[in-house]
């Protein structure tokens, strides 16, 4: 079984140790190194070439966003997940623009952390459910006010195929993604396993011709396929 090699960069030792402890419980994960500032991140990644870097956004010297930008340019094979206490849209979009593949709030639970690392390691993107919900609400607010959320270009692809290509279960999962639920939360609500939820999400992304969960939700809202609750 191939291991997912992980580096943790966070200037708070207790939090860093807590994250490592959670990841150590997952047999397919291996934390290969830790660091406590953004300036150190590049040296660590150059040496270990991890699959995933978990990066705190607020650190002395070089902050997490600047460190992420540097890592993406120098070591694009190492995918970065940002850790933050901020759920504001500006923080999230700034982090994603630098090339981060994930954005987690530090209030996350263990299941969300593990799920995010798995998704990002497999080449996907992951946003904390609360962040997804906030971004969707902001997009909806801009849409209803007649202001374009992306005036320069269309970020989210238009759907050329009708929604009825989704099964009823996939429609239920799509609605719960819009509600900001994690895979675990969806599974508990529908009484199905997290693995089954992941399969449904993968099918939804493929059928909707989008890259990640956030795009799927935003496109669904634009087309009136889900309710904002």
Swiss-Prot record:
GO cellular component terms, A-Z: cytoplasm
Hydrolase keyword on record: no
Post-translational modification: Phosphorylated and dephosphorylated by DegS.
Induction / repression: Phosphorylated DegU activates its own expression.
InterPro entries (alphabetical): CheY-like_superfamily, Sig_transdc_resp-reg_C-effctor, Sig_transdc_resp-reg_receiver, Tscrpt_reg_LuxR_C, WalR-like
Domain Response regulatory residues, every copy: 5-121
Effect the entry attributes to changing residue 56 to N: Lack of phosphorylation. Decreases degradative enzyme production, but allows full expression of late competence genes
GO biological process, one term: phosphorelay signal transduction system
Annotated localization: Cytoplasm
Gene3D superfamilies, per database record: 3.40.50.2300
PROSITE patterns according to UniProt: HTH_LUXR_1 (PS00622), HTH_LUXR_2 (PS50043), RESPONSE_REGULATORY (PS50110)
Effect noted on mutating residue 12 to L: Increases the stability of phosphorylated form
Single Gene Ontology MF annotation: DNA binding
Domain notes: The N-terminal region acts as an inhibitor, whereas the C-terminal region carries enhancing activity.
Described purpose of this protein according to its UniProt entry: Member of the two-component regulatory system DegS/DegU, which plays an important role in the transition growth phase. Involved in the control of expression of different cellular functions, including production of degradative enzymes such as the neutral and alkaline proteases, flagellum formation, biofilm formation, and competence for DNA uptake. Positively or negatively regulates expression of many different genes. The phosphorylated form is required for synthesis of degradative enzymes, flagellum formation and biofilm formation.
Designated name of the protein: Transcriptional regulatory protein DegU
